[in-house]
Amino acid sequence: MLSAAIDFQGGKAARPYVEKAAAQFTTVVDTENLLSSHFGFRAIPNMVFIDEAGIIRFIKFTGFDIRHETDRAFVTRFIESPNVEHLARDSEQGTGFDDPIALVHFQTGMASYRRGDTSAALDAWREAVAMEPENWIIRKQIWAIAHPERFYAGDVDFDWQKDQIAEGQ
């Protein structure tokens, strides 16, 4: 089993959540949003089941939560028999963006962030979100970078996030 954290700030920012979950498996960190770009999802958490031969057997975008009994039972069934035919395969792929200009803004933001220009990165990502307001991955990364205390100082502040959404942020 492998998990992937999408966090533009890297492993240092993702590590506390992996440790809190007491994960007994490897977690990799996607700092470039490559998974979203490849699979085309815009929100997390997600679940992708890949069998031992490397074949994608099932994808569930948005709403996966191992704490929910139905998701936990599904994971258990897959681990016990990963080649079962009843696991649906969702082959939808894309860039994660409907508008190619939004993708350009995202990539510009990533280049700025890698150069250490956080302000320019946030501006570019806000442009991308303005064009694609349903891209929750970028929106939440903006929030996490601009307001780390809401994400990295204990529990994630979901009430604050709801307030941001209500305010159109």
Predicted features and spans:
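Alpha-solenoid helical repeat scaffolds
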Residues: 106-107, 139-142, 157
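Structural microenvironment flanking redox-active thiols in thiol-disulfide oxidoreductases
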Residues: 1-21, 31-35
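Thiol/disulfide oxidoreductase modules built on the thioredoxin-like
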Residues: 19-24, 30-74
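Thiol-/selenol-based redox modules, centered on thioredoxin-like
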Residues: 51-123, 136, 146, 151
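Alpha-helical linker/edge segments of TPR/alpha-solenoid repeat scaffolds
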Residues: 144-169
